[in-house]
Amino acid sequence: MSSSSSIWDIIIDYLSLSSIWNYLQATLLGETSVPQQTNLGPLDNLAPAVQVILGISFLILLGVGMYALWKRSVQSIQKILLFAITLYKLYKKGSDFFQALLVNPEGSDLTLQDNNIFLSLGLQEKILKKLQTVENKVKDLEGMIISQKPTTKREYSSDHYCSCSDCQSPLPTSGFTSTSEM
């Protein structure tokens, strides 16, 4: 059983891509958390596979969501960014929870490190405000373009009959009806 266990470990190590993932997190996000070594038996072997599944599902959901939002309209860039940030946060929470579970399998005192949550929320809020101002400017430009278009004049007939739906009368009227005219 030792040979199948070592093959399983090789496959898990190959699929986990943990060194690439750690490098990307360290360079792009500034995260340098080093995973703690544990000796949990089967759970220790299962951890990289679960992280690979989380990563693949994150990428699939990100791709499907971005494609769906992109097909709706170009104005949904704000929604695409919000979707991507939210999906990444969900992935990060799941990954952090699983890491905390590996460290403490009993489940007591599971504390997740959210030291950058306020920073990321503030940055997200600033991005959303900027996108809203850009969206408002685009709407203003659309209004200006519409107002600059030449208005087409309707051709009126030489008849002076009332054409409103209330009084479709062939008689020329002033728009008011009184009992003395009848």
Curated annotation (Swiss-Prot):
The keyword NAD does not apply. Keywords: Coiled coil, Membrane, Transmembrane, Transmembrane helix. It is found in: Membrane. One of its GO terms (cellular component) is membrane. It comes from the Eukaryota. InterPro entries: TMCCDC2 (IPR031697). It is a multi-pass membrane protein. Residues 122-149 form a coiled coil. It holds the Pfam family TMCCDC2. The chain crosses the membrane at residues 10-30, 50-70. This is Transmembrane and coiled-coil domain-containing protein 2. It comes from Bos taurus.
